[in-house]
Amino acid sequence: MGFRRNFRRVLRKWKVIVYAVSFILLLQAFFTFQSSPNLIEEEHLKRIKELQIRKHQELAQKMLQGERSLVDGKIFLNPHDPGFREQFFKHANDSINILEDHDVGKVAKMEKLPSKLKPHNFEEIQFEAETKIPSIVKYQPKCEITLKDSLSALSRATSDACKQQIADTACKMQDNTLFPESMPRTCPHENKFKFDAPMPATFDPDLRPVRICYMLVVHGRAVRQLRRLLKVIYHRNHYYYIHVDKRSDYLLREIIKETEQYPNIKVAPWRMATIWGGSSLLRTLLRAISDVLKIWKDWDFFINLSALDFPIEKDEKLVQYLTKYRDKNFMKSHGREDDKFIRKQGLNRVFVECDTHMWRLGERTLPKGIIVNGGSDWVALNRRLCDYAVFGNDQLLVQLKHWYEYTLLPAESFFHTLVQNSDMCESFVDNNLRVTNWNRARGCKCQYKHIVDWCGCSPNDFYPADLVRLHTSRPVFFARKFEESINQEVVNHLDFKLHGEYPPGTPGLHSLWENALRVNEKIPPNCDLHVASVLQVEMYKKDEEFSGYVVTFDAGWLKAGESEEVIDGSARVQLQALLSHQPTLRMLDRTSALSKRLESASVGTNWDIKELVLRDWGGLIGPNSDLHLVARWSRSDDDFVVTVVVIDPVNVVADYNDFRTPSKAAGVTETPLSLKKPLRPGRWVVRFYVQRQFTNICAELDFYVTPLEFKDGAEGDSQLREINRGVVDDAQLNAASRNLYSIRTTLNLPHNNLAATELANQAVHVDGAKLRRWVDAVASGAYKAKDACLVAQATETWREAQPRRCYTPRQITPNLCENLNWSSMSPDPKSEMIPVKPDGRIR
């Protein structure tokens, strides 16, 4: 009874709560029942999902089985159904929600595709497990590449287009579809034919003299040497077609100006960036031949020269010789066994040119039925051969052009092989009419390995001691190479020998000027060197004078194709630069007493009153710096009062001061500048007057306030906006609250509203490239990079790091730092730690 009575008492007390809980449970059960799907509907949804998944899997399997081909730059993964890709994309878009459902089967998550997919936006589809997942990759190999050289090339190539070209070529190599197995030969001779063309004892005066079309392939900056070559080979009966390398803008502008007056000299309106050994060299030659065939109708021979060639015989003798053999073609063949030549020349290898590099992809078999011949790419071709090489379309020519598109040094054997296997083989003369100065011990150092996967050779420059090589048993009319910047005497010797010496006293005969820099010259895109990180800054003094800062830094070239400043991690070098402080003191009235006594002046921070020096070495000033004007005076019996006026970047007087020069002694004066902070960034000016004679400015001194890029070591602080703008109110510029009205009225300086607006616009940026450019622009007013050097053991470090797209012929490589006196890498015996000597000392 007691238990029952207690239970009723508790039930009465908690009755309301029990009813409430029961009601909530009933509501929850009701809504759960209402929201649950009908079993039939649930089964129907499940079947729809399974059907869609199965359809997608079948489609994926078809994709895997489909072939891949490249048609008009678009990739179709199943050539049997050109609309298959669009069908796949549409189905994929419709099935996105199902493919992302992790509760259904083993469907992997697929990255959501754009709503409107176009074939050329899609590069590759990859699948994983049973259900393959489409994904975008950088380039699309059409096969599994196994060739070792091709894999190496792919790992080193940078652009997607280049990788695709390498991969496509490698796949064709692997399935033996890149080259024909054989080519036709129409030469009536079984072996190579060579016609002997000696120098005739006499010439027939009744023969029509031949007219020559010279093609000059030039690059670099030696415009004076090119002008000199044109001068000695020029004749009004000949024609001259000049191709200027795409990277030689200065040379192009100069040569266009120089040749305007000559109707028989044309500069090619197109330009290629040719590289040593590249297939682009042959394309350049063939395109030039096509041009000159259309431009001029009456030339007989095509001769290619470079700016480093020079004639060793007069033009009249060359014309007579070619007139005698007007139906011949002059090419120098190799002087060794064919097999050895083919191996050394790399003709049994496949090469592809892209990214300004010749990539070796693997071995190949030479085509059957023809004789492969070659030697030098400097030739003299008659018009008939030129017309055939450009406009012919027979099987031999078409297949040879294709074969040489994948050949190293194609210009050195294309014309040789074409002639030897055509019906013009009897026109082949084994002589290219020139002498080349070979010194293989010095010229074969694999110096082109940074642009070609091969070790090549290059001829040497002629010196006077090499002139004996010009005497040969065969007829020769040109020699190479000559560089006046290396030796001008040998060029003078040949010039004077052919055309006589200039009159005595002619100026400039033994002088040379060669352009090194031209303002506003274009450079290859993304080929500026950018600072990656500053490693060290050292103050440098010479003969007790501050000479600047030596900055050690890592630098690199930007990645190809990047719109932002993204430095390629593999294209870096370590450099040192000497940043020299610009002289900023100008004496405007040299007759004044002030100009006669003032030796130097500077504005800076960290004034050392004990040593009477500014210890910030070079005046590195920011918006929050406390500034001091320090002047050094020579001895004089007279002293006087100096008035200095400080003018800010918007041409507003910010401070003035009076002080007396040292009396009857040399000395230093220091004047604190009372300027309200933050200082306005930009160029400030201090004017020197004698005893407030404001009509006569005796001297001016510039100093620069640099905006801040960091605050408390961090970028992007919003306070930088206010700091870098400086004091906004002109009335608040002076920290000492001096009344500047009188002096401002006296000087009557116009307010620079444009500078004020520019300052406000620049101060908006608290981080990013625009702020950095502003900092650099202001700092460059105070400092200039006087010199730079390479921190390395050898200059090859520069070439190995430099991107191939930035390579330019005859480019300037920085000096090694250890060879420059200003560099901290140069020897310093007085402070070098050495092993202990026998006397126990290291000094």
UniProtKB/Swiss-Prot annotation:
GO terms for molecular function: metal ion binding; protein xylosyltransferase activity. It is an enzyme of class 2 (transferase). Belongs to the glycosyltransferase 14 family. XylT subfamily. The lineage of its organism: Eukaryota, Metazoa, Chordata, Tunicata, Ascidiacea. Residues 36-843 are lumenal. One of its GO terms (cellular component) is endoplasmic reticulum membrane. Residues 823-843 are annotated as: Disordered. Pathway: Glycan metabolism; chondroitin sulfate biosynthesis; Glycan metabolism; heparan sulfate biosynthesis. Keywords: Disulfide bond, Endoplasmic reticulum, Glycoprotein, Glycosyltransferase, Golgi apparatus, Membrane, Metal-binding, Signal-anchor, Transferase, Transmembrane, Transmembrane helix. This is Xylosyltransferase.
